Swiss-Prot record:
Source species of the chain: Giardia intestinalis (strain ATCC 50803 / WB clone C6)
UniProt-annotated stretches for the region Disordered: 785-816
Protein name in UniProt: Intraflagellar transport protein 88
GO MF, any single term: kinesin binding
Repeat in keyword set: yes
């Protein structure tokens, strides 16, 4: 009977040589240092193999290669600092050291281990630094030498570099040839590199004005990438392949190509594909909310992401990777908006219809916030065309849609915003009020108390509108220092632009209201502060205006508008030193901004620093003359300052220059006429006053000055004719009648003089009021004068204000450098 087989009870992993075999110990158990030695067997781990010699040929070669890599690193570091001489020196040392390594390996029988890839790498660095250092031809010759031994990805990289050099040299056909060779050698496992090659091929085709070829190259590349992605086996590998493929930039180039070809259907299709390939989902923690029912990103996350993109919020709280993602999203959003501005006039007969189409595409794809930004671009386009009403309607619609989206997502919008906008639909507003009242009940607050308080505020607001001057005080909100959640749904600048439009219309109450809404939505909007400050200045609330300008400066230290406007307020308050500092800051940032330099000189003049003011204005004249631009107001102010300094010759020179540019300026004519009279040049003075009489026909002042010049030059008969002409138009002018009598007596016509003296006596005894206006003046002339005054708007501040300032003479009072006494009238008055 055979015995059944059973497995062994021990593994028998320990074997012994000889006759020794494991036995049960008959002594006490203890630690044995070397159990095998007791059995007469030596362990194979007792001794290590002998250490190789330290100065072996392999170790020397390896150390020399390490030194080569150090030289390469130092050379490229120097090249990054644009120190190309040092970089070439390091690479030259690396080349020599590599030659020594090759000789060392050959002499020691190690020729098979020569590192050819290292040699190619060194020469590629050498050629790259030559190209960066302005030696493209030498770089090409270097690449031609190493391209013969290169293969695979290295060969593709060399051909790509050669194509870039030829492209920069303007050899676009050669560049295309090298790019084609590069893309043939590039492995399909390098999708980003292949994409870069295809993009550069398209750029070369664009330079050759071969737009269709450029589009075909990119479209062909995209089709190949889609085919490769579809051929990948698993979903994970397919997703990884898509992640390695950047489709946005190629599609952006395709869109521009179709725009150049003028194919509207292709433009719209490319824009739709560009939206699909863009990265527009935010990774901000507050906006991440996964919808469990749909296994994807919720609509609230998309809305929050689009809102964040539209407002371009600060990314300081993000880590480096998230900041890079945010930067990429911002770049994609900006390019989408630029594409919309580019395509809108080309895809429809009217530009507004093009914007509407693109906005609808964005809205259909779920990007509501960016569609509002596109509508904002349409509104800005209408503003450039001076279609203010249409632009205002569009921006109000944008505001309504943004706030309604916020309310639909359950985001709390304060009642103050809802009441100030007056722009929401009744359903959305009622829903918002109901939700907020329920929140108040949960907090134990009676909504009726707040409603009563609000009704009092409304009554006060209605009463204030009836006042002659609106007191638009801005109440500081406790939440004014932080951006509110609902602010992300209103594109930045909507209410700021609306406030600006109402400011131009002269509706300062509406302008202030929208500026305040803009600040409640975004307290860090410097332009809203500037608009509000300008509105306050129009209602003579200078302290409030200055406060807003200073806030705008705190938010944006580079805001020249806020600094300049603050300087104007300081100038109005006669704080000339502070105003001068503000204007100088603007001039330092914008050296060619003439208004800042002019106002700086004006501040110096007000501080009695006449020489410095003259020097500054002279520099301004030189700067304008270099570009053949001339401002008569600068010449006028220079003439006034030279007159204050006592240099009448220079003053007359600059007033003549101003008169050459603006011959209709009565202020300039008045000064020149008075200057000629003081120097007894009555004929030149008469010519000036005759020009003034043709400009201003509503007063006999200038005709009297002409007649007085004739009397001063002893031309009594011509003076008599002029006085009679004046009395035909102004029969009750006693001044003309008195001088007429005097002139008649001077030429011996006493009888006629007595007749005029009798008329003067009757006129004086009857106390008939003197008529200073021309009775025959046509109503058309008055209307033309009113139109000419109305045509001078806020944009003409430089010319208008300076003419008004120069309309007066200098008085003896040092506090007011420009008085209000007529120089010519004083000089021509007879004792």
């Amino acid at each position: 009977m055979t015995q059944n087989w059973r497995p062994q009870s021990r593994l028998q992993t320990m074997t012994f040589a000889g006759t020794a075999r494991p036995m049960t110990s008959m002594t006490a158990a203890g630690f044995t240092k070397n159990p095998l030695a007791t059995a007469g067997v030596a362990s194979i781990f007792d001794k290590l193999p002998p250490e190789p010699p330290k100065d072996s040929p392999e170790q020397k070669a390896d150390q020399m290669e390490i030194n080569i890599f150090k030289l390469l690193r130092d050379g490229m570091s120097a090249a990054s600092c644009k120190d190309y001489v040092t970089a070439l020196g390091r690479i030259r040392e690396a080349i020599k050291l590599e030659q020594k390594v090759s000789q060392h390996r050959t002499m020691n029988g190690l020729a098979d281990s020569i590192n050819l890839d290292l040699r190619t790498c060194i020469w590629m660095h050498w050629a790259q630094i030559q190209a960066l250092g302005g030696q493209p031809e030498m770089a090409l010759s270097t690449y031609e030498k190493i391209v013969k031994t290169a293969e695979g990805a290295t060969l593709a990289q060399i051909r790509f570099n050669m194509g870039n050099i030829n492209h920069n040299l303007g050899k676009y056909n050669e560049a295309l040839k090298n790019f084609r060779m590069a893309i043939d050698q590039a492995s399909p496992s390098l999708p980003r590199f292949r994409q870069k090659i295809a993009s550069h091929m398209a750029q070369s085709c664009i330079k050759l004005h071969r737009w269709q070829d450029a589009v075909d190259r990119i479209e062909e590349y995209l089709i190949k990438q889609y085919t490769l992605a579809s051929s990948v086996g698993t979903d994970v590998e397919r997703q990884n392949f898509y992640a390695m493929t950047t489709r946005f930039d190629p599609l952006y180039t395709v869109l521009i190509g179709y725009y150049a070809l003028g194919v509207p259907e292709k433009m719209i299709d490319a824009y739709s594909r560009l939206i699909d390939s863009s990265i527009l989902i935010s990774d901000h923690p507050d906006s991440l909310e996964i919808d469990d029912h749909h296994n994807g990103i919720s609509s609230k996350q998309i809305a929050m992401a689009d809102a964040e993109l539209c407002n371009m919020s600060n990314d300081d709280e993000l880590d480096d990777l998230s900041r890079y993602n945010a930067t990429l999203r911002h770049e994609h959003t900006n390019k989408l908006l630029i594409s919309a501005r580019l395509l809108a006039p080309a895809i429809a007969w009217e530009e507004s219809q093009g914007y509407a189409k693109l906005s609808d595409i964005l809205r259909e794809k779920g990007h509501h916030g960016i569609s509002l930004q596109v509508q904002m671009s349409m509104a800005l386009t209408l503003l450039k065309r001076n279609e203010f009403e249409k632009a205002t309607d569009i921006m109000l619609r944008i505001d309504r849609e943004g706030l309604e989206s916020a309310l639909a997502l359950g985001i709390n919008v304060p009642l103050s915003i809802l009441q100030k906008t007056r722009n929401l639909s009744l359903t959305a507003a009622a829903t918002a009020v109901t939700n907020q009242e329920s929140d108040l009940h949960l907090l134990g607050i009676d909504p009726s108390v707040l409603a009563n308080q609000q009704s009092v505020v409304d009554r006060d607001a209605v009463a204030s509108r009836g006042a002659p001057e609106v007191d638009m005080l801005k109440t500081d909100d406790d939440n004014g220092t932080k951006k509110q959640p609902y602010a992300a749904f209103v594109p930045r600048g909507v209410h700021t632009n609306i406030a600006f439009i109402y400011y131009l219309k002269g509706d300062y109450e509406a302008s202030a209201r929208h500026a305040q809404i803009a600040l409640e939505i975004d307290p860090y909007d410097s332009f809203a502060h500037i608009n509000l400050g300008c509105t306050y200045s129009k209602t003579n609330q200078w302290e409030l205006s200055l406060r807003e300008f200073l806030k705008a400066q705190e938010i944006n230290m580079e805001s020249v508008q806020a600094t300049y406007n603050a300087g104007l307020v300081y100038f109005k308050q006669q704080e000339y030193k502070t105003a001068y500092s503000c204007f100088q800051k603007v001039a330092s940032k914008l050296p060619s901004y003439g208004d800042a330099i002019y106002m700086s000189a004006d501040c110096l003049a007000r501080m009695s620093q006449i020489d410095e003011a003259i020097q500054m204005l002279s520099n301004l004249v030189t700067m304008f003359s270099a570009v053949k631009a001339y401002d008569p107001s600068i010449y006028i102010r220079l003439g006034e300052l030279y007159s204050i300094a006592g240099d009448e010759g220079q003053a007359a020179h600059y007033f003549k220059e101003a008169h050459r540019l603006v011959p209709f300026s009565l202020a300039v004519i008045n000064w020149l006429g008075s200057h000629y009279i003081k120097n007894e040049l009555y004929e030149q003075a008469r010519v000036c006053f005759e020009k003034a009489s043709r400009v201003d026909t509503t007063t006999p002042k200038w005709s009297l000055a002409v007649a007085a010049c004739l009397r001063k030059s002893k031309q009594y008969r011509d003076a008599i004719y002029e006085y009679k002409h004046i009395l035909k138009r102004f029969p009750t002018n006693t001044t003309a009648m008195t001088h007429l009598i005097s002139s008649l007596n001077n030429i011996g016509q006493h009888k006629e003089a007595d007749e005029w003296a009798e008329k003067l006596t009757k006129l004086t005894n009857n106390k008939v009021p003197e008529v200073t206006e021309d009775r025959e003046l046509d109503e058309f002339v008055k209307q033309e004068r009113r139109n000419s005054v109305a045509a001078v708007g806020p944009g003409s501040r430089a010319g208008q204000d300076r003419f008004e300032a120069s309309n007066n003479r200098v008085s003896s009072n040092t506090g007011d450098l420009f008085g209000d006494v007529d120089i010519a009238e004083e000089l021509l008055t007879e004792n």
